[in-house]
């Protein structure tokens, strides 16, 4: 067993550094459904199979045609005439022995007619190149069950993605440049006691130059506050004065020249970090005050039960503060001093997590859930990351398309720049209308391009008029979309495959933050944009 674990660690080494063992476990226990084994679809699955998605099912009733072989590297000449789902599944499964693949040789329309609940058994569903009418039916089915749907589409030199999920909660958002949780502005009792054991004025030189910078800042902060009415250095001028105060504490040699004490230089450098005020961010406050946090039920997810437990901790043991994160950065110090300081933060974090665990136990009992339904590991993970919680709520596709609920004002505002990527969204909606009316996409055959330009323009104007949008789209966009002929270039499919797989992994692992809710890629100009539509 240990050997198997070691082999997996070697195989997935790089990704384990990104999302950890628990993230990999979530990935390996996931079951993803792909609708349509197009070039885009197989590229997405490739990027999920390689990192070890547990199980995938391809739904596709089409047989492999010559055009599929032309733009899909996972299909061969010998595949022509065979079911596209089965052929793609067999070839994709060869990429990773740890992954299990299934296929359903039926169209999504057939499954939606026969058994809509079929799609509700998956961790998430990814659709590619679906017509609008089918997409709306699928989205409605999954919305009610809160099953995430990732819509992907490559259309000529345009890439499109839409995430549709009622609510997606993120514990490990991995923010860039996150501030340390040191609590030097309000030291907890264990830290205060440890600080009192240091006397920087009566130390041997070796000890003085190997004292952790956190201790150095804390000791001089006490001195500053005693001389400034208990206030923290706030303005730039005050912080510079505080740095000078620390600088004066550097030992001097017999000639009065300051010694080279790197720990003090480190303290001066980290003043802004150390003086960070302990407070709860507005985004986390919003989560803790959310109705789902306040009004728990038997259906409440573990995220909301944990959030409520943290809120109760803050009202009692936390005295208004979140549980301590329990980590400190690396620094210049001797091992003994650093480890003692590190352990003080760790033990305080464990103590806070234990208090939260008690709250969780009571809350689980109150909503009729078994105590083991939220593990100790989950509680500690939540406490360690509770300063960076995120909740993403997407609008439904029905709301986006509804005449009364569409974000018309936002679209008009964006179209003040006639070349904004939102114009590509409008064109995709127009070609869908074209397909609905004529049963094909514009420009499929070269001889139709010229005549289809006028028809597509009419569809676009009809769409704009229906939504009451007084907008003008440049003719060159209409002409370009007719020239695309609904082609799915592999270069665009490949780009989307990487981007979509990344979002899928975020959804499955509940790590990092997904976009909300629409992504447009303009390959002509190598630009992209996200919109909340």
From Swiss-Prot:
Any GO BP annotation: protein neddylation
Region (Interaction with uba3): 330-343
Keyword vocabulary terms for this entry: Ubl conjugation pathway
CDD domains in UniProt: APPBP1_RUB (cd01493)
An MF annotation (GO) of this entry: NEDD8 activating enzyme activity
Positions marked as site (Interaction with uba3): 210
GO CC, alphabetical: cytoplasm
Pfam family, one: ThiF
Pathway membership: Protein modification; protein neddylation
Superkingdom as given in the UniProt entry: Eukaryota
Function according to Swiss-Prot or TrEMBL: Regulatory subunit of the dimeric uba3-nae1 E1 enzyme. E1 activates nedd8 by first adenylating its C-terminal glycine residue with ATP, thereafter linking this residue to the side chain of the catalytic cysteine, yielding a nedd8-uba3 thioester and free AMP. E1 finally transfers nedd8 to the catalytic cysteine of ube2m. The covalent attachment of nedd8 to target proteins is known as 'neddylation' and the process is involved in the regulation of cell growth, viability and development.
Subunit (UniProt): Heterodimer of uba3 and nae1. The complex binds nedd8 and ube2m.
Protein family: Belongs to the ubiquitin-activating E1 family. ULA1 subfamily.
This protein's name: NEDD8-activating enzyme E1 regulatory subunit
Lineage, top ranks: Eukaryota, Metazoa, Chordata, Craniata, Vertebrata
Gene name tied to this protein: nae1
């Amino acid at each position: 067993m240990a050997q198997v674990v070691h082999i997996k660690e070697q195989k997935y080494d790089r990704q384990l550094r990104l999302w950890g063992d628990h993230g990999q476990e979530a990935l390996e226990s996931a079951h993803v459904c792909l609708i349509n084994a197009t070039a885009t679809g197989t590229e997405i699955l490739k990027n999920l199979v390689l990192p070890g998605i547990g199980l995938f099912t391809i739904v596709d009733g089409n047989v492999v045609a010559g055009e599929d072989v032309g733009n899909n590297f996972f299909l061969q000449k010998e595949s022509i005439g065979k079911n596209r789902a089965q052929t793609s599944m067999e070839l994709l499964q060869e990429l990773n022995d740890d992954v299990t693949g299934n296929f359903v040789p039926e169209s999504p329309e057939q499954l939606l007619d026969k058994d809509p609940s079929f799609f509700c058994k998956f961790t998430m569903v990814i659709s590619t190149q679906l017509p609008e009418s089918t997409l709306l039916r699928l989205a409605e089915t999954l919305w009610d069950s809160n099953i995430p749907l990732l819509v992907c589409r490559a259309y000529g030199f345009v890439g499109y993605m839409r995430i549709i999920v009622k609510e997606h909660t993120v514990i490990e958002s991995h923010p860039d440049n996150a501030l340390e949780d040191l609590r030097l502005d309000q030291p907890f009792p264990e830290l205060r006691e440890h600080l009192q054991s240091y006397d920087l004025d009566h130390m041997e030189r070796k000890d003085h130059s190997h004292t952790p910078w956190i201790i150095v800042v804390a000791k001089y902060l006490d001195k500053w506050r005693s001389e400034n009415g208990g206030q923290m250095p706030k303005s730039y001028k005050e912080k510079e004065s505080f740095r000078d105060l620390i600088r004066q504490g550097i030992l001097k040699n017999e000639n009065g020249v300051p010694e080279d004490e790197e720990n003090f230089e480190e303290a001066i450098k980290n003043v802004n970090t150390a003086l960070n005020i302990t407070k709860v961010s507005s985004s986390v406050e919003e989560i803790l005050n959310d109705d789902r946090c306040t009004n728990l039920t038997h259906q409440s997810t573990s995220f909301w039960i944990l959030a409520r437990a943290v809120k109760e901790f803050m009202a009692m043991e936390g005295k208004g503060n979140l549980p301590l994160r329990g980590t400190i950065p690396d620094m210049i110090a001797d091992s003994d001093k650093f480890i003692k300081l590190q352990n003080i933060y760790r033990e305080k974090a464990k103590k806070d997590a234990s208090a939260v665990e008690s709250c969780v136990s009571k809350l689980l009992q109150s909503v009729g859930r078994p105590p083991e339904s939220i593990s100790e590991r989950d509680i500690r993970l939540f406490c360690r990351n509770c300063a960076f919680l995120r909740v993403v709520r997407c609008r439904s596709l029905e709301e986006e398309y509804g005449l009364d609920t569409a974000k018309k004002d936002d679209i008009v505002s964006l179209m003040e720049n006639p070349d904004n990527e939102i114009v590509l969204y409008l064109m995709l909606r127009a070609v869908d209308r074209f397909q609905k009316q004529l049963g094909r996409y514009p420009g499929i055959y070269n001889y139709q391009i010229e005549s289809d330009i006028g028809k597509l323009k009419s569809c676009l104007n009809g769409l704009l008029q229906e939504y009451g949008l007084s907008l003008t789209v440049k003719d060159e966009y209409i002409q370009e979309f007719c020239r695309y002929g609904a082609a799915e270039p592999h270069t665009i499919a490949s780009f989307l495959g990487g981007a979509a797989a990344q979002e899928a992994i975020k959804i499955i692992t509940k790590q990092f933050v997904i976009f909300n809710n629409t992504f447009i890629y303009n390959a002509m100009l190598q630009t992209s944009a996200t919109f909340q539509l």
